[in-house]
Structure formats: C-alpha cells, structure tokens
Amino acid sequence: KISGIPENFWTDLDPRMLRQILNSVPLSGLPAADDLLLRALLAETLGDETVLNTRVQALIERGAVQAAYSLLGQAQIQSQEGFALFAETALLTGNVERMCRQLNLSRHLSDNEALKVYCQARFGSWNTAELNFFTLDTLGAFPPTLSSLLAVDLDPELADSLGLPNVEPNQLTALEFQLRAGAGQPVPTQGLPLKFVPSDLSPSSGWKNQIEAAERLGAVGSLPAAQLLERYKSGQPSASGGVWDRVNAVQNLDLTLADPIIDPSDE
C-alpha cells in the first residue's frame, strides 16, 4: 500500500477496544506521531464497517473531516451509524448533494427527521419538505432551536423575526452549524470542537480566521505544514500583536531563507 500500512492492519479488532485505544491517544502536537496516526486511520485496509466507523470518528474528532468524508465515500454504507457519520462529514465539508440524494432515495438510512427535511428541501421536493416539517413540528418532533432553524431554512424571510438562543459548543451538531450559517448567523469556530474548524479554511473566511484555523489543525497534524505556511504568506498584516506577530515572524524568516547566500570568497 502507498501508505505503508499493511492491508490487514485493522482486521480482527474489537471495535470497542479500538475506540478505547483511540480515545486514549492524545492530540500530541508531535508531527511524526500525528502523521503516523493519520496514515493508519486513512489507510486502505480490510476491516468491517464498525471498525471503519471508529476510524472515521477519530478523524472527525481531530478535525480531519475532509479525509473522513473521502474515506466514507469509498465505502458501501449500509448502517444508520455509518450514514450518520457520512452525513456529519458531508455537512462539515459542504459536500451535501451526494449524501442528500442517497438519503432521499433510502430514507431508512437515518432516523434524523430534521436531516430528512433539510435534504428534501435541497434535492427533492420543497413542497414535500415543507409539509413534512410542519407535520412533524406540530407533533413536537423538533427542539425549539432546531424548529426555528428549519423554519428559516424553508422560508429565509423568517430570519429577522425568529431569534435564536446562544450556542452550546458541546451540543452543537453539524446540521445546526450549517443551518445557522444559512440563516445568516454563522457560529464562530473559536472554542468549538476541532471538527468545525475546517470551515474557516474557506476563501470566504477572513484571513485571520483562516490562519487561526490552520494553526489549530496544524497543531494536531490534521493540516499539512505547507498549507499553514501558505496562509501565513497570503497577505500583509495591517496590525500587530497575537496572530499578526506570528505572521510577521514567519514572513521575515521566509524572506531571509529566500535571499541568496553571499560567499565572502567571491567578493
């Protein structure tokens, strides 16, 4: 294998024990250790779906959501657990079309009625989505915050009249994160779990947000150092202190290394 990981690396493992092992692995910040773990988690190896789901969950928790999405995209998802992870990574990466079309065709893959409304509104029948939402909402199927977010998603004009409560970082779901962004009330990723941080790498995010997101992900090995360096070099800081001091330091070092070394003997 290109990864250097044996094909049978993940076979014959107890998923519960694997979960315990992965939970005990710290976010070390040691590049060699983080790189080895990520290569192992991403390796194309044999193993059942439960083991795959455990690996994907570990990737999500480390903020490697695009890698987790790609890994699941190569699998034949047959369980609700596997599809829940696929939906989470799709929402976190913005790659929702394939996931939603699959859910619209195979609704047994999820019991998440809010996700079904979300997907039906985008890649199915908007009228059906609206009918399902109002029916389920009348029956009390959605918590108040989620009900408001889905209502705004179906009718953006309600955004100004429906106030949303503050976010609980440890209770925020990928669907709510996307719905809040769509309602014009995006959730800042500072202080949120790592899985939400890659959204700030988008070109539409401010430069400062991109740098801080790249730093958080780079610190646990979920973003290549070259991509962090690219963001440090992508502009000129107009302020000082904090992140801007780091930007200046990196840019000055880069300029120094780029200068030709003058050999005194040539003078």
Where in the sequence are the language-model features?
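Alpha-helical solenoid repeat scaffolds
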Residues: K1-E267
